[in-house]
């Protein structure tokens, strides 16, 4: 009887401890695709152009109390790139630009998310990670702003890149006089509880 009572107490204690540990691990946040956007901003003939990626998925595991444990990943469907013109949209999918047939996805995986120095707690972070476009991977670093919105959170950021680092624009399109080398990938990701 004493053995049974001790075993039952130990089992209940173990289940309770497992429940506490499980609840302490942040669950991935649910991304609201209808409210979230990813776009690329660049200059063509010195005129600003913004194009949207209409299809992407994001995996975010984030707790503002433990930013060092946070993780983020984004997969972008390259064929969803929209310049607002069907002819241009077809052109950028070709080998000289994105080569979407061979490289249908671009991706980002974070390696570090740290609270930004001097910023109010839980609002600004420094993010580093690996960005892969057209089979080329490069380290990127960018500021991230996080704010509460209802029961969810909003993540905003801008990732500066050079398109030629990723071989975007081959042949005659390597000339940065037509299309600038500097590109900013902007994102606005809304999560729900």
What are these model-predicted stretches?
Residues 24-193:
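Low-complexity, acidic/polar, glycine-enriched regions of mature
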Residues 15-25:
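C-terminal segment of classical bacterial N-terminal signal peptides
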Residues 1-14:
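Bacterial N-terminal signal peptides that target proteins for export
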